[in-house]
Regions:
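A short glycine-rich, His/Asp/Glu-containing loop-to-beta-strand
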Residues: 1-17
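Conserved hydrophobic/aromatic beta-strand scaffold that supports enzyme active sites
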Residues: 9-11, 30, 48, 56-58, ...
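Short histidine-centered beta-strand/loop micro-motifs
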Residues: 10-12, 20-25, 42, 48-49, ...
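Short acidic (Asp/Glu) patches
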Residues: 14-17, 35, 60-65
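Glycine- and acidic-residue-biased ligand/ion/polar-headgroup-sensing regions
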Residues: 16, 25-44
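Short Gly/Pro-enriched loop/turn and capping motifs at secondary-structure junctions
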Residues: 38-39, 64-66, 83-86
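Short acidic-glycine-tyrosine-enriched beta hairpin
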Residues: 43-64
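Double-stranded beta-helix
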Residues: 69-118
Length: 118
């Protein structure tokens, strides 16, 4: 967590053949696939992209919602989340693409503090 630059680096692990909740990236981000395949799905569940281990991608905010998950094995991905401000990083969406919740730099910073205190 970099308070000055408003950057959060975090490892995510997605289970094999599972999809996380529908969401939209609303801030810049970079990803690096450490293990497995990072799979990107359309809101309807169709496979759009497969990123194998070793894949680096710089991403921009995107109005297109999607789901993500692992391939034949669990996937571990380094996400470098770069909102550069206190605006939302993610919007969590329902099936109608309505915003259920958001995640901000402050939310991730608080989660990090709680983890360090445990």
């Amino acid at each position: 967590v970099d308070d000055t630059a408003k950057i959060v680096d975090v490892l995510f692990k997605f289970s094999a053949h599972e999809k996380i909740i529908l969401h939209r990236h609303t801030a810049n981000f970079n990803t690096f696939v450490i293990q497995g395949e990072h799979r990107i799905y359309s809101p309807e569940g169709d496979l759009k992209e497969i990123r194998p281990a070793g894949t680096y991608k710089a991403g921009l905010p995107d109005i297109e919602p999607h789901k993500e998950g692992g391939g034949d094995e669990d996937v571990i991905i380094l996400f470098s989340l770069r909102p550069y401000n206190d605006d939302p990083i993610y919007e969590i969406l329902d099936d109608d693409h309505s915003v259920l919740d958001t995640m901000t730099f402050g939310d991730l910073k608080e989660m990090y503090k709680e983890q360090q205190a445990a």
